[in-house]
């Protein structure tokens, strides 16, 4: 395979970093703001010394304040150092809002499919139906969380599947780019004592997102999917998303895990279940199969 411009033929008018430098830059773009803001976040009682969010306010702070500086740093680097256009990092294509919203709907559907599959396998027990609808305040918070997760998910897609994937692909090839992006994505989501199944699911999550972006030729759809996945998982079932609790009643059905952590995902939530990994493998295979049947730049969410 040869170097390729994934999203746009627009040339970089500045300097593209060496391949070995891109993971270091990505880690710095994420780590420096976290370290700089850690003391202040703790002083506001928004995070613990380990960096975990405290309550609903802490979750909002993490999703906005924790990700905004990273987005600003990556966009500034892409524009000022590389001279890259927004199109070259995946923010291109017709009807971006429509594509994003369709991706959002796919996110709702796919995470619901995973949760229902775990429940049917005996890993979940229902403990209440639509309790959030009894509280207007809870519904308001759930709506605000949708905006927060839309921002957080969009930032992650811009920096990983947008900027990093496109830069490495221009310097090497698509296979190396997908592998490197997914490894760095895993590294930045790693926490001590995390079960191997969780890391496998995180790696497959990134492979799936890369496959989607690679096929559609933009990141609008996968941005929406990522947001829909995180939000409904956090608010729909009273289950943790990547180990974080929204502290809100369920929008759909309150579920309680039962059985082995390999089935339920344990403290990490359904993303730590082997059934979630099975879903990602099947979805990646489906995308690869679809690529042989429809044109490369047809949106995944346009059918």
Show where each model-derived region lies:
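Membrane-helix interface segments
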Residues: 95-97, 138, 171-176, 194-195, ...
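N-terminal, membrane-interfacial amphipathic/helix-forming hydrophobic leader that caps
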Residues: 1-86, 234-303
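Membrane-interface helix caps and helix-loop-helix hairpins in membrane proteins
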Residues: 188-197
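Residue-level recognition of membrane-helix boundary sites in multi-pass small-molecule transporters
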Residues: 88, 176, 198, 220-221, ...
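Functionally important transmembrane alpha-helices
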Residues: 198-262
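Juxtamembrane helix-loop-helix connectors linking adjacent transmembrane helices
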Residues: 35-61, 84-155, 165-170, 300-303
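Residue-level signature of the transmembrane alpha-helical core
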Residues: 64, 104-108, 142, 146, ...
């Amino acid at each position: 395979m040869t170097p390729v411009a994934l999203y746009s033929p627009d040339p970089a008018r500045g300097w593209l970093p060496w391949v070995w430098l891109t993971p270091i830059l990505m880690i710095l773009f994420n780590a420096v703001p976290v370290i700089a803001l850690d003391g202040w976040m703790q002083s506001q009682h928004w995070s613990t010394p380990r960096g975990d969010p405290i309550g609903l306010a802490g979750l909002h702070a993490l999703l906005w304040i924790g990700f905004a500086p990273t987005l600003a740093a990556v966009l500034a680097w892409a524009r000022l150092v590389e001279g890259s256009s927004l199109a070259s990092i995946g923010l291109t294509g017709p009807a971006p809002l429509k594509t994003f919203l369709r991706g959002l709907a796919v996110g709702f559907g796919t995470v619901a499919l995973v949760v229902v599959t775990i429940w049917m396998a005996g890993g979940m027990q229902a403990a209440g139906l639509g309790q959030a609808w009894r509280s207007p305040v809870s519904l308001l918070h759930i709506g605000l969380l949708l905006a927060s997760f839309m921002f957080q998910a969009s930032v992650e897609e811009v920096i990983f599947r947008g900027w990093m994937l496109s830069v490495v692909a221009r310097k090497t090839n698509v296979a190396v780019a997908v592998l490197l992006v997914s490894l760095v994505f895993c590294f930045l989501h790693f926490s001590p004592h995390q079960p191997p199944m969780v890391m496998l699911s995180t790696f497959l999550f990134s492979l799936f997102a890369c496959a989607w972006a690679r096929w559609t030729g933009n990141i609008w759809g996968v941005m929406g999917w990522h947001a829909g996945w995180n939000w409904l998982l956090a608010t729909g079932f009273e289950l943790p998303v990547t180990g974080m609790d929204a502290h809100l009643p369920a929008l759909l059905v309150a579920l309680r895990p039962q059985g082995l952590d390999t089935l339920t995902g344990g403290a990490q939530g359904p993303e730590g279940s082997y059934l979630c990994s099975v879903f990602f493998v099947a979805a990646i295979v489906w995308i690869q199969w679809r690529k042989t049947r429809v044109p490369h730049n047809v949106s995944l969410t346009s059918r």
